[in-house]
Amino acid sequence: MLRYSPMSSLQYPSSLLQSMILPMRFRLLLSVVSCLYALCLSVLGAPPLEELEQAAFENASRAVQDSVVQVETFGGAELVNRQFAAAGPSTGSIVSSDGWIITSSFPFRNQPASINVILANGERKPAKLIARDYSRELALLKIEVDTPLTPLLASDRKAWQVGQWALALGKTFGPEQASCSVGILSAMGRVWNKAIQTDAKVSPQNYGGPLIDLNGRAMGILTPINPGIVSEGEVEQWYDSGIGFAIPFQDILDRLPRLQAGEDIYSGRVGFRWKGNDEYSEAVVLQGITPGSPAAKAGIETGDKILAGGPAPDQLVAIRNHSDLKHVLGPVDAGGTIVFEIERSAERRQLQCELVRELPTYREPFLGVLIDPTADPKTPVIRGVIPESPAMKAGLQVGEIIESIDKQSINQERTLDVRLGNLNYRDSVPIVLK
């Protein structure tokens, strides 16, 4: 411990002095090494770090100049969802040498009368809108070419690291030179596992342009997709928010054959809803199943607990909460399949669903009985029967107990309401009474 002397000076123990001297020696050595390194750089004429970074940015941007085009639209609706539709030029990215161009669907919300693509050499080509990916806010264009174009090359997704440099390119000011903003890859698996995130400055004119690495390879295509998007008219609220999103380029290439065939792509819907509102702390316990939905056809029931999900039985990932479920469902398109591992009555089973674009219109099944609210839910007692209802036509009587419906017993977990909720409107099912 420190000792106080009458001279108001501090005397340190020898062990403490030794521990202080070592860091001081280390700092002195580090300073000497730094000075020598700086001296060597000045003698050898090596460029400073800022110049090396600038050269890397310029080389990466230059590598994709011919693969980035300007997209012009003309005509179409002036208002979309009570907002003025975009009319200025936007950006496209060449994905094949024979004239296929991926871009954002942002300029096409107003259904333009004509589309032009301006290549890097200034040549203007008429373009056709072939298909759209509504889930990712993308569109595929086709132009006719006389000479092969230079397509983007895909970045190695396995090598990505959060924090690495990322460059956002767009043909904002003219077709000859792409504008470039510098940032980092700030997050992956965003927008329910459909996008990557960057802090590079992104504007509506950059949408459709590539997000590239320092090797000039495409990491993704910039798009106005956002986590809370409900309709196309809401994309502007994220402009200049400090972050931007890009759809991974390899994901686009995987779907390219479908788009080239003229097939529009939509988000897949499964047809169940779950209990609770906490995204991160509550397990996924199903509260309802839409009749006729993929979930209903797969045999998923109200009360099931979802434990895992994935594209195949050997590719399941754990689903611990609502957020995990959304990340599993997010990238699955309509027509795609997903396997769920569920827990029901302490037993585990795997069920496969084929997701659809739209769920069938739900009409709540109507039996026509009033249940005694004081009765045990496991033994629902009929308190009243509504005239002309299915229950009256079937001969149900006041005082009877409903034991099962559609060959499914009534119990604490599977109450009468739950069993009815799993039926379709106008289903004809057997009811066992006591």
Regions found by a protein language model. Name each.
Residues 207-210, 280, 290-306, 328, ...:
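PDZ/PDZ-like domain micro-motif
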Residues 44-93, 97-100, 104, 112-114, ...:
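N-terminal activation segment of mature serine protease catalytic domains
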Residues 48-61, 149, 214, 218-278, ...:
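C-terminal cap/linker of serine protease catalytic domains
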